[in-house]
């Protein structure tokens, strides 16, 4: 199965991404497609809600995961796809393509949900090494540069122990660059996963290091 981890480096500059590429060049097999991500935070303005119910909701969208939106609230998550099945078209149930869920929150449900924050990265770089797929991106918010994001993806043949060693190796590499202030969130359990479950976990990793 495939394991994921997300690392966030705060005390760095936008040019750190170039320095990282130089360090990775010794292990680099190939470079992949550009990619982007966005984490949005919403807060409800609805009255008379359950006092035990959190007023905050997050959405995570990753371009390399079909731009599907993962919505996280109360430690539960759903995926809203950006496609419609052929059967729904054939039945005349829908026309056109669905709007992203976070777009509906911001534009059609703005009387209930107010967007409070957006952290995103565009034109990220993907690297393939012998052991990992590594996606790197600069993270920005409304106030400017926030830090460097690294998404790690194991080979499907790796076990959890091998992946954890590779995560630690990347942390050591960052430390060698003078980057020791690193937040890390990665898969910790071993066993078969459904594709949706992997995307839920990956979105949760982004939220943990950026939230």
Curated annotation (Swiss-Prot):
GO terms for cellular component: mediator complex. It is found in: Nucleus. Its main location: nucleus. The keyword 4Fe-4S does not apply. Keywords: Activator, Nucleus, Transcription, Transcription regulation. GO terms for molecular function: transcription coregulator activity. GO terms for biological process: regulation of transcription by RNA polymerase II. Belongs to the Mediator complex subunit 20 family. Component of the Mediator complex, a coactivator involved in the regulated transcription of nearly all RNA polymerase II-dependent genes. Mediator functions as a bridge to convey information from gene-specific regulatory proteins to the basal RNA polymerase II transcription machinery. Mediator is recruited to promoters by direct interactions with regulatory proteins and serves as a scaffold for the assembly of a functional preinitiation complex with RNA polymerase II and the general transcription factors. Component of the Mediator complex. This is Mediator of RNA polymerase II transcription subunit 20. It comes from Kluyveromyces lactis (strain ATCC 8585 / CBS 2359 / DSM 70799 / NBRC 1267 / NRRL Y-1140 / WM37).
């Amino acid at each position: 199965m495939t394991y994921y981890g997300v690392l966030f480096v705060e005390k760095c500059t936008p040019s750190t991404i170039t320095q990282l590429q130089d360090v990775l060049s010794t292990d680099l097999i190939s470079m992949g497609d550009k990619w982007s991500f966005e984490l949005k935070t919403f807060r409800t303005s609805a009255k008379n809600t359950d006092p035990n119910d959190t007023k905050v909701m997050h959405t995570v969208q990753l371009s390399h995961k079909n731009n599907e939106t993962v919505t996280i609230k109360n430690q539960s998550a759903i995926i809203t796809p950006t496609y419609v099945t052929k059967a729904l078209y054939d039945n005349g149930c829908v026309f056109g393509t669905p709007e992203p869920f976070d777009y509906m929150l911001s534009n059609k449900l703005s009387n209930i949900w107010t967007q409070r924050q957006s952290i995103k990265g565009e034109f990220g770089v993907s690297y393939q090494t012998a052991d990992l797929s590594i996606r790197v991106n600069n993270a920005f918010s409304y106030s400017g540069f926030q830090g460097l994001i690294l998404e790690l993806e194991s080979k499907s043949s790796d076990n959890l122990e091998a992946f954890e060693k590779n995560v630690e190796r990347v942390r050591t590499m960052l430390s060698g660059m003078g980057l020791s202030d690193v937040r890390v969130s990665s898969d910790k359990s071993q066993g078969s996963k459904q594709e949706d479950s992997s995307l839920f976990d990956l979105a949760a990793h982004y939220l943990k290091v950026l939230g």
